[in-house]
Amino acid sequence: RGEVALPPDPARGHAEDYLRMVSGDEPEARDIRAIEQYLVLTLDHGFSASTFAARTIASTGADMVAALVGAVGAFSGPLHGGAPSRALEALDQIGSADRARPWVREQVAAGRRVMGFGHPVYRTHDPRSELLKAIARDRGGDLADLAVQVEQEVEAALAELKPDRPLYANVEFYAGVVMEQAGVPRSMFTPTFCVARAVGWVANVLEQARDPKIIRPTARYVGPPAPRPVPVR
């Protein structure tokens, strides 16, 4: 795009220098601390799709680069690495706390996902989300206040519309808020998430490399039944 990438500064800390390079500005101490906390909170989280992809590739004997490329490919999906920006876009669409419940009803009626809410593992509040919420509230401002109010309204609406499946704010909901507060451009939300998770990918690949067995999950056929033989007379 004709933009010049800023070179890294080895004299700076990791979070400080990363924030300087992605924002183009000299970061403030509170922004550095917020991004540092975000990077630590999201660096690893079990066998997510990208981590499992990395380990599967590593189990074939492929090198680290191949495993990380596969992880990035899985991470590019909007339901995984692209979720923080979409969650913040949803917050933009809602606009105010009194719009939250009607907005949720519209999404559910249309069969669309409510980005920033629900998790395949957690059936309660995501502990990472609670920590990021605390970071956002400590920073304060209209965006943090709106996020907290919208979270309460959306969770109440989802409890009404989906009583058999409790859905709570996940890590992506407040991740976007924290990154926005710290001055990270929205186009860099997913790369920032990727920078954090790369630490976990590397650790998982190194661990997988110690096991010489290839990962080959068992599949269960769910298609139409086999044709019945017709007797020949």
Question: What do the predicted segments below correspond to?
Answer:
Residues 1-233:
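Non-transmembrane, aqueous-exposed alpha-helical and coiled segments at domain scale
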